[in-house]
Amino acid sequence: MSQDFYLGNPNLKKVGTEIQFTKDQIAEYLKCKEDPVYFAMTYIKIISLDEGIVPFKMWDFQQELIESFHENRFNIAKLPRQTGKSTTCVSYLLHYILFNDNVNVGILANKLSTARDLLGRLQLAYEQLPMWLQQGIVVYNKGSMELENGSKILAASTSASAVRGMSFNIIFLDEFAFIPNHIAEQFFSSVYPTITSGTSTKVIIISTPNGMNHFYKLWVDAQKGRNGYAWNEVHWSKVPGRDAKWKETTIANTSERQFTQEFECEFLGSVDTLITASKLRVLTYDDAITTNGSLDVYENPIPNHDYIICVDVSRGLAQDYSAFVVIDITHAPWRLVAKYRDKDVRLYPYILLLVSMVHV
């Protein structure tokens, strides 16, 4: 029977293998296709540190996450450490490539090794599926996987070059808050348009907070309805076995600040910032009323108002950014009314002169 297996692996079905389905299997297949939560609870298996390979016994919040992924195009979730978030996401991605033909999924993380580890978890779960639920294997390695139904899944780092030119039906971004701001910005500018061009494509962003960065902005915008992301958050106490005693022990073994960020999921600013994190969190920001390239304008110039422009220029060699902000100082509190940020302009860009003529 080894001829029915992919490269002799008895846990993987070979392309072209015929399966004689029973009536019960057909009904079960259709049930799994329609309900990703049922599929995960019934057929996904994971590795337990104590018991080896065991069924994935989902907690309520994990079921809610999968339902949100299934029902919404754009998802962002803020979760504590060690809540099974990776296994939950992998379960949904496996369901997606199994029951949808000719789709591409990208598993992306701040490190290539992390993305490949996630793909490895998906492959482990795949090998535990019964043969009648599997698709035949076309490609199966540490970095990618392709099924007989034409669906593919790729593990890569979140660099613009890693996935440039590719099209994805789902992009899963793991621990997005730990990706440097400039890399996240480049990544979205190169890959995000391919997602938004579709009508059923999805973005899933999962992370524990790591300061007040790009993930923080996406999260706040989602909560305030400024973007199209459905948002989910999980408190550490929702994980069985985590109580006040567990919290006390964890803080004793780490620190109060570490617990607050990694388990309470608070967005903490750096201790070295000029403005305190508590103040940064209460500051408001609005969408620009006009945008022209790298220039965002939040208020049009008002006659007889006083403005200042703060400028920080670079060499214009596509490395550091040239930037300036325009601030209305007529009345307290002062307001930022325009900003500019670009790394491809020459020293003392002409746009600075134009903005100065309007506001000063």
Residue ranges, per PLM feature:
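Conserved Walker A/P-loop ATP-binding site and its immediately adjacent core
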Residues: 103-124
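Nucleic-acid-processing active sites and adjacent nucleic-acid-binding tracks
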Residues: 147, 293, 303, 318, ...
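Walker A/P-loop
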Residues: 72-93
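Inter-Walker segment of RecA-like/P-loop motor cores
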Residues: 118-169
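Pre-P-loop entry segment of helicase/translocase ATPase cores
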Residues: 1-74
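Conserved Walker B
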Residues: 175-179, 314
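ATPase catalytic-site recognition across NTP-hydrolyzing enzymes
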Residues: 186, 237-313
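ASCE P-loop NTPase helicase motor core
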Residues: 124-128, 134, 178-254
